[in-house]
């Protein structure tokens, strides 16, 4: 035992001596890393129309700086867009003349900046594409082709409404899937296993009634049976995060849902008693598992965590949206005026939910007697599902030549850090920036100049017309 103690002392003395040499050994004090600002840069991207013969554009807005950081040209008559992966956005260009070609524009990003040349994927000519979606984290895009002609040489009059399957790796249309008349909306379940298509005949031709749903397995593109019927044509689809439900908004405002839990099908279609007349879009909030359905002068807040969707708040009824008083607008606002006890009713047509789940925002507008579009944003507090505030957004003259018939006259998107929400206006030619910390209007970011003639007294061409808005990389 004493021997082991003696050896231990000798080892200890050796270590002390070794540390007392002439060589300096600095004491290293760890320098903690600088963590990124939680309000990291995020973008929103506005897709802008520039008339029937000129290329449209994308406008990139930096959320952290409330500024425009990039502009890129896309194809003629862009109508829709979707983000694919962390650094790529696909823009769908409908094209409007025999000399232009329908296409997908591939916009690459490095951070918040457009990176390199915007690529192009050609689509069948004159196929009138109107919607694009992708499977999450996939390299496949699905595009509606209402006027697709499989053999334009031998059978130029034979139209087969289809969904185009596009590889964004090879930049080619790899297959088509026949669907019902006038496909206008596509949804892919988050697990990438199923594809659903809303077919709406009146959307392509108001004189043609009817509508239907189509369903397919994405692996082999085989059809899935659907049981149940709709009382009016479908206009919007929203899959639930668990891929077990797909919600269907009908043209009459009724909310229906598809039960997709049976592996081989059939998928069961059921209508709910929920109705929001005038609604054309829905926004799914995956954080809270609910839908926001704006329409008319109201918005329905719908809990979809249950088997049967239920309206929450306001005693089971949609929340009414009041008109922002015109006397509360600034004197320079074209919509400014004296108080009236009977303000015009607004039309709600866009919504966005903050990623942090704290609030939702609804875009609405009315047109005054002078032809001005008077827009506003209503704030919904998600903790008690009530209206928190109404924000006036400066008005502007209408531009019915393009915007009266565009599918998305107003669109909305939220910044990735929940600090901003944006309202894009086709008529207004720009993107309105809302500060969510104060629920107040900040600034209007104009779209790029168009190829239209100046409108006196201005000497400059008016801006292009935003027709869609999405959160970006």
Predicted segments with their positions:
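Predominantly soluble domains enriched in secretory-pathway, periplasmic, or organellar proteins
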Residues: 20-473
């Amino acid at each position: 035992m004493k021997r082991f103690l003696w050896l231990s002392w000798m080892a200890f003395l050796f270590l002390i001596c070794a540390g007392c040499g002439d060589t300096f050994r600095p004491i290293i004090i760890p320098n903690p890393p600088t963590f990124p600002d939680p309000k990291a840069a995020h973008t929103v991207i506005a897709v802008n129309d520039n008339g029937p013969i000129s290329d449209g554009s994308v406008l990139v807005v930096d959320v952290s700086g409330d500024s425009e950081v990039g502009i890129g040209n896309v194809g003629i008559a862009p109508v829709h867009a979707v983000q694919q992966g962390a650094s790529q956005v696909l823009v769908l260009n409908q094209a409007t003349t025999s000399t232009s070609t329908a296409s997908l524009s591939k916009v690459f990003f490095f951070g918040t900046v457009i990176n390199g040349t915007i690529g192009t994927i050609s689509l069948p000519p004159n196929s009138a594409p109107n919607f694009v979606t992708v499977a999450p984290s996939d390299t496949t895009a699905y595009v509606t082709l209402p006027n697709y002609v499989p053999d334009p040489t031998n059978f130029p009059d034979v139209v087969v409404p289809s969904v185009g399957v596009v590889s964004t790796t090879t930049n080619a249309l790899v297959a088509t899937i026949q669907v019902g008349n006038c496909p206008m909306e596509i949804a892919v379940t988050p697990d990438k296993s199923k594809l659903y298509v809303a077919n709406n005949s009146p959307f392509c031709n108001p004189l043609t009634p009817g509508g239907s749903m189509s369903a397919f397995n994405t692996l082999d593109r085989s059809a899935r049976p659907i049981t149940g019927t709709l009382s009016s044509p479908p206009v919007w689809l929203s899959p639930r995060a668990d891929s077990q439900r797909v919600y269907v908004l009908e043209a009459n405002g009724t909310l229906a849902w598809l039960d997709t839990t049976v592996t081989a099908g059939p998928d069961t279609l059921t209508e709910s008693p929920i109705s929001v007349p005038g609604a054309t879009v829905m926004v799914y909030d995956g954080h809270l598992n609910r839908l926001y359905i704006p329409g008319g002068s109201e918005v329905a807040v719908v809990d979809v965590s249950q088997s049967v969707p239920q309206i929450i708040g306001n005693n089971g009824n949609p929340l009414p949206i009041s008109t922002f008083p015109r006397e509360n607008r600034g004197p320079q606002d074209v919509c400014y005026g004296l108080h009236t006890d009977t303000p015009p009713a607004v039309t709600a047509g866009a919504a966005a939910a903050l990623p942090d789940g704290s609030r939702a925002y609804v875009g609405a507008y009315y047109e005054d007697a002078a032809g001005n579009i008077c827009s506003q944003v209503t704030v919904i507090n998600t903790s008690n599902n009530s209206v928190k505030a109404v924000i006036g957004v400066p008005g502007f003259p209408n531009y019915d030549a393009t915007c009266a018939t565009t599918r998305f006259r107003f669109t909305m998107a939220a910044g990735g850090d929940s600090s901003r929400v944006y309202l894009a206006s086709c008529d207004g030619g720009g993107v309105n920036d809302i500060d969510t910390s104060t629920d107040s209007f900040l600034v209007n970011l104009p779209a790029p100049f168009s190829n239209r003639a100046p409108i006196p007294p201005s000497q400059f061409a008016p801006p292009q017309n935003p027709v869609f808005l999405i959160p970006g990389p």
